[in-house]
Structure formats: C-alpha cells, structure tokens
C-alpha cells in the first residue's frame, strides 16, 4: 500500500451507511437528473439497489435518515425543501473542494469499494466522460495527495493495482486489504457487463420513481 497523507476523516470517519448514501446521490445526480435531488424514499431504494453495489445493503428509512442528519452537520449533504416532499442532494464538490471528475470517482469508490483503473473507466461512463485510464489516475493521485484516496499495490496473483477511498475507518481499510489477499481477483459469480448493469440500474430507478409517484397519489386521496 502506497503511503499517503493522513485522511482528514481519520478522527471522524464516514460509516458504511454514510458512504453508501453519498455514492448513491452522486450516481443519481448523473444518471437520473430529472428526479434529483432525491426524496428519502427514493434514496433508500438507491442505497439498496441490487446492481452496481458492493456489498448489497438493506437499509431502513430510519438508518438513512439518521445518517443524512449527521452528513448534513458535516456539510456533505443538503436538505432541499419542497412543496410535496423534502429532497436531499450531496455537496461533496463544495464541502471537500473537489472538481466533478473527482466527485464521480469518489462516488464509485463509495459504492463498490477498491477498484482497478480499468474498472473505474468502465463503470464511470454514466457519471463522467473520462478520456482514458491516465486521466483517472491523475485525479486519483490528486485525491490521494489530500488523503482522500489510497493506492493499493497489487498482490501475488493479481493483475492490477487498486484504489479505494480513505474517508472510512482504519478498520475498513484493513478489511479491504485483507479481502484483496484472500480473494485476489475478487471473482464474482456471473459478473454483468457495464451495459447490462446500466440497463438494470435504469429499470430500478424507473421503478423507484413509479413507487414514489404512487405514494404521493395515495397520500392525496
């Protein structure tokens, strides 16, 4: 593991729920701008999505709501008051002084853990238009220089180095490194292509929007 500056979150790290919320907001801002910012219900569905999430979670509205209040206090999310429902948006760019490519990369690292440059290039196609892996490497190095990401050197049996975010706890980092050692290529059963994942994610988003609309209609009866 390459030595990087201490993370500014070392004394108050993000929880796994915090990271999932922020990653989901980053993703939906890019992929479904027509429904962003997200209501609490839509955000819960995004967090619990079955695709493009490692690991898959089953969070409750109470868990997400509690985490949102904590993130709001840290200046990482913002509540947008609405006539029908309150909505939430992330403020990572402003809160951490990041440019759009860096926000996109952090979002992916929040959602799927340590990833290779090629994985990030493939998975980022709906979040930001990166030219190549070298452009991704450049922004990751900028993040690492501020203690927000870390370069994990490949181990025996692995073909590529990986990167992960450093906004979580030391225990999260150690667990990720240990997982890399026990499962070098992180083999996944029946891995989906990026296009297939995108189509499934879009369907899940449409379903979430329909469920939210139905809830509003029932509430107006």
UniProtKB/Swiss-Prot annotation:
Pfam families: DUF480 (PF04337). InterPro entries: DUF480, WH-like_DNA-bd_sf, WH_DNA-bd_sf. PANTHER family: UPF0502 PROTEIN YCEH. HAMAP family: UPF0502. Belongs to the UPF0502 family. This is UPF0502 protein PSPA7_1674.
